[in-house]
């Protein structure tokens, strides 16, 4: 007989209070909804949080709280959308946070974690790779050691790119 069954061992995850005073429903009440601020984000490249003003950031936090407060309602806004996750620098937490969020919102992911498996290894420029990404995905998240990588790729992208760090 299985040793665990003999001892009646049950494994349960404790549910920690990760919110403290910042529970999503409290956040929803404290920030007035103003969707006008989010309209400017449609199909926009995200290079740095510095590019957003306070009002846009507050509306993003409010939207995130809406998703978290009612995850069943927001299960598929990215259905049919493909994220190209190009992490040319090791970063497990950052990569998985982007991929998990995209997946939880109903999207699909194409993940590249090794520069040597791309055309870059054969001498293609990031601009060339960006042109290829236009044909396969709806959004790119890029992390690279080179600070100019995002701007190099932006030259040829017709889809949004998110800078995941460099």
Features from the language model and the residues they span:
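Positively charged, low-complexity intrinsically disordered leader regions
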Residues: 4-96
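Phosphate/diphosphate ligand-binding glycine-rich loop within oxidoreductases
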Residues: 76-166
